[in-house]
Amino acid sequence: MLPPMALPSVSWMLLSCLMLLSQVQGEEPQRELPSARIRCPKGSKAYGSHCYALFLSPKSWTDADLACQKRPSGNLVSVLSGAEGSFVSSLVKSIGNSYSYVWIGLHDPTQGTEPNGEGWEWSSSDVMNYFAWERNPSTISSPGHCASLSRSTAFLRWKDYNCNVRLPYVCKFTD
């Protein structure tokens, strides 16, 4: 039998081992974010702790990101998981539009100078741990340096695109 003082430390050690084991086995942490407990402005939808809105008035990538930054903690959407990607896809598809591409917050400020496409980053500065490229831009002879969601992939996959083209866009923000 363990002395009373050892019980909390053993419990903590067991919990730490279980958490480490789930990471080592490659088990994805929670697939779906908890249901939203935030209120979002009209025309936007909640997912996790953020609001998301699709804007159909086309803008260049830079102008779209600047428009998103006018909202609290806003940027063009960063897609950080497959579950979030599915949510954004359903948001874009729920509002009928004739566009083939929609801006997201991924861009390559190095304009392809980093090897193997490593210059890509989210405008929100979120860490890139999830990738959903339609085709890896480092394998394309003349890639664009901004990313869009592509209708041909049901708005689930990313495609590099010319940053100056005017497209609809998705903002992610808090409210």
Curated annotation (Swiss-Prot):
PROSITE patterns linked to this entry: C_TYPE_LECTIN_1, C_TYPE_LECTIN_2
Spans annotated as Sufficient to activate EXTL3: 103-118
Binding site for Zn(2+): 50, 107, 121, 145
Subcellular location per the Swiss-Prot or TrEMBL entry: Secreted
Key words of the record: Acute phase, Antimicrobial, Disulfide bond, Inflammatory response, Lectin, Secreted, Signal
Organism superkingdom: Eukaryota
Record-level Gene Ontology MF annotations: carbohydrate binding; hormone activity; identical protein binding; oligosaccharide binding; peptidoglycan binding; signaling receptor activity
Domain C-type lectin per the UniProt entry, residue ranges: 47-172
Protein name in UniProt: Regenerating islet-derived protein 3-alpha
Organism this protein belongs to: Homo sapiens (Human)
